[in-house]
Amino acid sequence: MAAALLPRAPLAHTLSLGIVGAGIGGLASAVGLVSRGFKHVTVYEAAPEIGEVGAGIQVAPNFCRVLSHFGVLDRLTPQAVRLGGASVRRYVNNEQLNSTSFANLEPDYGWPAFVVHRGDLHKALLDRALELGAQLKVGSQIEDVNFEDGKVKVKGQPEVQHDVIIAADGIKSAIRSKMMARRGEVDETIPTGEAAYRVILQRSQMESAPDLKQLIDNPTAIRWVGPNAHIVAYPIKAHAAFNIVSTHISNTVGLTEDWTARASKEVMLKRFDGWNETLMKCLHLAPEGELVEWALRIHLPLTGWIDHKVVLLGDAAHATLPHIAQGAAQAGEDGAVLGTLLAKCHRKEDVPHALKMYERLRKPRADWAVEMARVTGEALHIPDGEAQKARDEALKKASTGSQSPDRWGDKETQRKLYGLDVVKQADMEFSRL
């Protein structure tokens, strides 16, 4: 579906907007602004170049809606896999505990669910942002930000002043740390005690085994749930590749500055020894020497996202666990809402009100999504025993409409996540004033 032309912002030629961070959140905010006609949008990225990174990522219906607003969704679909459903299975014997069809998503919410490679999503957002006039400055290490006057100091360069600075610098956000320190608060990310392995297999590795070929051919996301761990897997790259991500208890990562560690394939295989044969076949195919284990951390809900001319967005504002596939989606919604509200401003004096409304609309929803991801992880990782048996029974009953302990497949959670058009909501809320 082609994106409709968006109304041009009254202050399109007036406001100067600086975005710190060129991840998905930063680029989503850039596209959200330039698609409204803003002419002075600069994205600062510390990395010396932009490259394809990451693995698979789920694009839920609410994120599809935002990407369509941005004119980006059509660029993704040739490389995407449209999910037909999800299957939750017991780790040891591959027994299906729950099957959720996604056939209802487009009729109910207007959009399907896709899975893509993160690099494809990132490139689509970057291309769209640059196409519409955003400036990207790589190798731009931010040394300081002045909250009151909107000045940004990039290492080795003179200060630049913006009317709004959007901090999309991720869970390790230095700008968030400064903001919290100004409030007398301590900025601290919280180790969850969990880590993740990420594996991508190619179709050529899987075609000779019928059970593996079925996995990559079938547009279904699978969760294998076990004691203190679960694994999610699905095809990406138009079924040319297969994405596998584990979440598991680990004490080996999280102490280094970058929260990652080079991982041993042998250790990974030992960790999941005893899981079902089909999954273990996949893990044995993981390329040698390419495995990385990274720590999963969260941040407690912040007291606020705004300080004068600086506003937080994406993981800098609401870092989450990946268990309901909403990290990128919520960052995308942030960018869409912020662009919508700033486009409503007729005077620079209106901007502080737009920022406050952004926080009022976005913070409760994003914080709720973070909590839903947390409780889902707890439910998926229950050790074998009576509590696990009760969880499995609840998963089976959820196939017929009961509440699911896996909130990603829970109908009521889906309704809250997928049923809200955040752009329309922002437009209506601003118009009521």
Label each region the model flagged.
Residues 50-51, 174-175, 319-321:
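Catalytic P-loop NTPase motifs of RecA-like helicase/translocase cores
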Residues 93, 123-288:
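Conserved FAD-binding catalytic core of PHBH/FMO-like flavoproteins
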Residues 16, 39-40, 241:
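Residues at the starts of beta-strands that form the adenosine-phosphate
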Residues 31, 35, 41, 48, ...:
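Preference for well-ordered, secondary-structure-rich cores of eukaryotic proteins
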Residues 19-36, 44-47, 166-167, 233, ...:
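Conserved mid-domain beta->alpha element of the FAD-binding
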Residues 3-14, 18, 78, 88, ...:
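C-terminal helical "tail/cap" subdomain of flavin- and related membrane-associated enzymes
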Residues 53-128:
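Active-site-adjacent segment of FAD-dependent monooxygenases/related oxidoreductases
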